[in-house]
């Protein structure tokens, strides 16, 4: 396994390719969707949220999180460690492990023969009462207007 300090790319926790690393290299706990969320520091190394909280050290005017692998400091966001970016690759890998398998989508060939006869329910919100505009019944040959009184009646 390559390490970021050895010149390799920082993976999940800095200990290898993203598909291999799903645990924190500090506490050896597997990442999860609650207390051990994978948080990425500015240097690119990833550790669980619980360990990053322990690394968060107050300085005189700002709080900094020193990376235990490369020692680069990451400023603590205003909302704390929970506001650091998630390591999305690790998070999605953990989420995929935890969620039940999804059903396969229907093949497109089975949908080709069925005609759409009406709009699926819930697609658009129900509209309230619509204004009613009366249809013009008369046409004036003189001015071309559709709203003139009936032919043969006196014009005003």
Curated annotation (Swiss-Prot):
Gene3D superfamilies: Zinc/RING finger domain, C3HC4 (zinc finger) (3.30.40.10). Transmembrane segments: none annotated. GO terms for molecular function: zinc ion binding. The keyword Transmembrane does not apply. InterPro entries: RING_finger_domain, Znf-RING_euk, Znf_RING, Znf_RING/FYVE/PHD, Znf_RING_CS. A zinc finger (RING-type) spans 24-71. It comes from the Eukaryota. Keywords: Metal-binding, Zinc, Zinc-finger. Disulfide bonds: none annotated. The keyword Zinc-finger applies. PANTHER family: RING FINGER PROTEIN 224. This is RING finger protein 224.
